[in-house]
């Protein structure tokens, strides 16, 4: 996955890619690959608590701030960012949104797609995003699609680590050494000021997964790592 030429990361909310996949994004772009980040929502309702402490806050202003934060974080990592702005808590994905996602996947033709786990009892938006991404990926590459539409080579599908992996059925199959690019992940996390409380937590997770990566690989130089679960068979 480190050497993928084209990577697509799809999150339910604007900041999801930063906590869960900033490292692999930076690794891919460092090696000359291209990464696109898509957020289905800005997380304006359920994931912008710090911003709502302002009694004069508005939904549109929260969206603006989250867009600026996510765009800045993506730029730090060498990626592009776009948001479908579907609205969160609850996220609703209709046929039009699914078509939009399918067309984007067809246009980007990614080698690898990373998204949420299929289960998350603590966040109803994440499983919906995961299901939509998997369905759109199949529609973009499936032989059953009408011949009037172009299709692409199927992408490898991975799931990034949720905040509570034990409750989401997350079993890591792939560890990525992000030690060399961890300063970039730190900068990207710092750009997401609306969720600053997650910075230290995600740093500790990267150290925790590095310990697993060292044991599995035998490499003693891994200081920070990200964990992923492969869906598509090899």
For each feature predicted by the language model, list its residue ranges.
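Active-site rim/loop-helix segments in enzyme catalytic domains that contact anionic ligands
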Residues: 1-108
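Metal-dependent de-N-acetylase/amidase catalytic core
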Residues: 1-8, 91-234
């Amino acid at each position: 996955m480190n050497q993928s030429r084209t990577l697509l990361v799809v999150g339910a909310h604007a900041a999801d890619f930063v906590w869960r996949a900033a490292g692999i994004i930076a690794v891919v772009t460092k090696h000359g690959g291209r990464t696109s980040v898509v957020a289905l929502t800005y997380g304006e309702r359920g994931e912008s608590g710090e911003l709502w402490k302002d009694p004069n806050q508005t939904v549109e202003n929260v969206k603006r701030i989250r867009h600026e934060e996510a765009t800045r974080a993506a730029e730090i990592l060498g990626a592009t960012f776009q948001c479908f702005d579907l609205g969160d808590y609850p996220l609703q994905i209709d046929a039009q949104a699914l078509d939009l996602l399918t067309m984007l996947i067809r246009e980007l033709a990614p080698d690898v797609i990373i998204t949420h786990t299929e289960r998350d009892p603590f966040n109803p938006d994440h499983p919906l995003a995961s299901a939509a991404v998997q369905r759109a990926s199949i529609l973009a590459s499936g032989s059953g699609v009408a011949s009037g539409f172009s299709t692409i080579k199927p992408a490898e599908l991975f799931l990034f680590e949720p905040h509570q992996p034990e409750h989401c059925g997350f079993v890591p199959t792939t560890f990525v050494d992000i030690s060399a690019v961890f300063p970039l992940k730190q900068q990207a996390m710092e750009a997401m000021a609306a969720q600053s409380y997650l910075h230290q937590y995600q740093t500790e997770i990267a150290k925790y997964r590095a310990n697993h990566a060292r044991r599995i690989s035998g490499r003693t130089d891994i200081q920070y790592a990200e964990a992923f679960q492969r869906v598509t068979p090899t």
